């Protein structure tokens, strides 16, 4: 009887530590959870997670996608929800009133230290601290030494030129040792496929 009690207690503690499941509603948490969490820990992701241009090798192929709306999130109130609190303050307040565990991920790490702190935080939440620490160590050890004339970078998506002055993109460029291309592009549609396939008719 005593052995059974000890086993049950250990099983409960193990489940409590690693049984937490997550709903990701931001691109940042989509990417980092795909890197740090076990597949069974991720129950739903944002619509960004289906976009290979944003997710690269971490595209969501088998999880439902959710919009940041209360009705869509009601079935997931027992999960830990990652959401951009700055964009959806009212939704965050409503979720907290309903007892949901909300973790703000504002998608705007301004510095390397903020990015590394976020990675370590998610590593702790997912129970994967060792991998998170290794990832941070790897990023810190990178030595990006590019020729200065070649560091100007134009970022494109499938809908046009990416505004590289946004904080999240600035942090990425800084991490890679790159600088935004300073050319007077207009806000016209500039899809990447037109650059890669200039001779194709549209």
Predicted regions and their residues:
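Acidic/histidine-rich, surface-exposed loop or edge segments in extracytoplasmic proteins
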Residues: 53-58, 72-77, 98-103, 116, ...
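Hydrophobic packing residues within well-ordered alpha-helices of enzyme cores
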Residues: 32-33, 91, 95, 169
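N-terminal signal peptide c-region/cleavage motif recognized by signal peptidases
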Residues: 14-17
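Alpha-helical, coiled-coil/dimerization segments enriched in small aliphatic residues
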Residues: 47-51, 59-60, 163-188
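Sec-dependent signal peptide recognition
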Residues: 1-10
């Amino acid at each position: 009887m005593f052995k059974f009690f000890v086993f049950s207690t250990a099983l409960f503690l193990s489940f409590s530590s690693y049984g937490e499941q997550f709903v990701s509603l931001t691109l940042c948490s989509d990417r980092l959870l795909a890197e740090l969490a076990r597949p069974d820990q991720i129950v739903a992701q944002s619509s960004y997670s289906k976009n290979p241009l944003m997710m690269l090798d971490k595209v969501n192929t088998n999880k439902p996608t959710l919009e940041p709306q209360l009705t869509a999130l009601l079935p997931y109130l027992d999960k830990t929800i990652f959401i951009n609190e700055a964009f959806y303050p009212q939704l965050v307040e409503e979720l907290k009133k309903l007892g949901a565990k909300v973790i703000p991920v504002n998608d705007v790490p301004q510095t390397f230290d903020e990015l590394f702190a976020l990675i370590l935080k998610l590593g702790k939440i997912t129970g994967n601290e060792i991998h998170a620490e290794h990832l941070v160590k790897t990023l810190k050890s990178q030595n990006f030494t590019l020729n200065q004339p070649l560091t100007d970078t134009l970022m494109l998506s499938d809908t046009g030129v990416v505004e590289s002055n946004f904080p999240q993109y600035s942090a990425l460029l800084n991490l890679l040792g790159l600088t935004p291309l300073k050319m007077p592009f207009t806000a016209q549609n500039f899809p990447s496929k037109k650059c890669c396939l200039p001779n194709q008719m549209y």
